[in-house]
Curated annotation (Swiss-Prot):
Natural source organism: Geobacillus stearothermophilus (Bacillus stearothermophilus)
SMART domains referenced in this protein's UniProt entry, alphabetically: Ribosomal_L14
GO molecular function terms attached to this record: large ribosomal subunit rRNA binding; structural constituent of ribosome
Gene transcribed to yield this protein: rplN
Keyword Chaperone attached: no
Pfam families in UniProt: Ribosomal_L14
SUPFAM superfamilies in the record: Ribosomal protein L14
Protein name: Large ribosomal subunit protein uL14
Subunit structure: Forms a cluster with proteins L3 and L19. In the 70S ribosome, L14 and L19 interact and together make contacts with the 16S rRNA in bridges B5 and B8. Part of the 50S ribosomal subunit.
Claim: Ribosomal protein is one of the keywords in the record: yes
Family (UniProt): Belongs to the universal ribosomal protein uL14 family.
Family matches, as PANTHER family: 50S/60S RIBOSOMAL PROTEIN L14/L23, LARGE RIBOSOMAL SUBUNIT PROTEIN UL14M
């Protein structure tokens, strides 16, 4: 369950390696984020020369969770880690590459650019 103070791995080449969730967007008392939800986060670890720097506040969309998500057919999809992709305000990714698989649920939430860049959509 992704909530405030959760740390997420960054699954793109924007320069950030790890972020810490500040807020889950979508409602005043919203506590948890799942796949496809947007969070406000701060960069805790970054590569030198990247687009985003350590300490910067960014928006990110959750693309993988350990908790997983239930599909309409009753099956569950789970991943080995909690990961996100840093995005701009228009839902486009800040980086130019996506690493690792992403869930099909992102298509329902209109993150088509992330879907097209991802090496595998599960």
């Amino acid at each position: 369950m992704i909530q405030q103070e959760s740390r997420l791995k960054v699954a793109d080449n924007s320069g950030a390696r790890e972020v810490l969730v500040i807020k889950v967007l979508g409602g005043s008392g919203r506590r948890y984020a799942n796949i496809g939800d947007v969070v406000v986060a701060t960069v805790k670890d970054a590569t030198p020369g990247g687009v985003v720097k350590k300490g910067q506040v960014v928006k990110a969309v959750v693309v993988r969770t350990k908790r997983g998500v239930r599909r309409p057919d009753g099956s569950y999809i789970r991943f080995d880690e909690n990961a996100c992709v840093i995005i701009r305000d228009d839902k486009s990714p800040r980086g130019t590459r996506i690493f690792g698989p992403v869930a099909r649920e992102l298509r329902d939430k209109d993150f088509m650019k992330i879907i097209s860049l991802a090496p595998e959509v599960i």
